[in-house]
């Protein structure tokens, strides 16, 4: 009964079940019924420790098919960069969305101690993002400071914001889901 039993909660958390029912009904429409917990079981769930270190170790063992990497350089996150690079080369696919082509995006051809590019089977997609100087909007961070700024120049080439790339991916996934015919989609 998980999230539906929150009798001890106070404040806004006490409204979580009502909020979730409304959200799930908005997502799943007529398929969200009390009998199927409004589709709650269709949502992806964390299976345990999903930290970056554990995920990279799982990738190294071949247990992860692909990764979406936004604004990180996981090939050199750990002091043992060979460990991260080897893990990345075990993926079937890798999407890197970053301001610059970094070691993660170029792991298939620019690893000084790695295999030849022809031996790497990972399909890498590099999506260039724009910097904060190249986009309008609000910016916030962990210090709870919120700022608004105007773009001072256009982004070069095909650079887009992380949000733009994510939205485009979401549109395509939605189209695929609509074609599946499954109630959860």
Describe the residue ranges of each PLM region.
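Non-catalytic alpha/beta scaffold blocks inside enzyme catalytic domains
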Residues: 2-185
